[in-house]
Amino acid sequence: VEKMKQLIVITGASSGIGAAMAKAFSAKGHPLLLLARRVEKMEAHKLENSLSVSVDVTDAAAMKAAIASAEDKFGPVGCLINNAGVMLLGQADEQNPAEWSQMLNVNVMGVLNGIHSVLADMKARKTGTIINVSSIAGRKTFPNHAAYCATKFAVHALTENIREEVAMDDVRMVTIAPGAVETELLSHTTSQDIKDGYADWKEVMGGVLAAEHVAETAVFAYEMPQNVCVREIVLAPTRQQP
């Protein structure tokens, strides 16, 4: 009997990069735990050996419970991909502080909640991979991105910090930092001016990355031997200048 491949857990798996990652890892024969709020969108992927659970990443207990149920079925988590994120753009003096809280909760606490759910077990087993989807906005600043950049700089920092902590336990921590990608990410930004500006920018670049390109980088990093940690991958449209 062929040994089943390792379980991959993906947050924000209902659309965009998370959905593309689910399809890419499924095509490689991995069982999947897909986590997002919109369960029907995840089930619509119709992927073999996949479990879709409606989980808000800010709910640590729900995340731990979902992971435990998937591990009962598919064995221990081989790779966790913290991909769920929100981007709410606005000027610092005008933006609703509730939007800052939402971003900090999802983009930072959500990632930490995911890590907390699997890390002790990975250390005990002396193997495992955690891939955190950050952003180029975790490396440099952009207009109207103050709080978003704060959350993504946080993701870069915590990933590298934990990487050093768990390196001797043979656990890999990977940061993927995409530039502009074709997803629903911008759809919740409230300012129409900012949305229009983004659309114009996309046109100047002649299009943006497809989510599949980001998914391929995750597969690449994961499929390296366990003694090779691809610490960070930065990818963007060739014509994206900043």
What label would you give each PLM region?
Residues 28-43:
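Conserved glycine-rich Rossmann-like NAD(P)H-binding loop of the short-chain dehydrogenase/reductase
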Residues 115, 151:
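Active-site helix of classical SDR
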Residues 14-15:
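Conserved glycine-rich cofactor-binding loop
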Residues 175-176, 196-237, 241:
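C-terminal helical subdomain
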Residues 54-65, 97:
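The beta1-alpha1 cofactor-binding region of Rossmann-like NAD(H)/NADP(H)-dependent oxidoreductases
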Residues 91-92, 96-101:
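Substrate-binding pocket helix/loop in short-chain dehydrogenase/reductase
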Residues 135:
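Residue(s) in the substrate-gating loop at a strand-loop-helix junction
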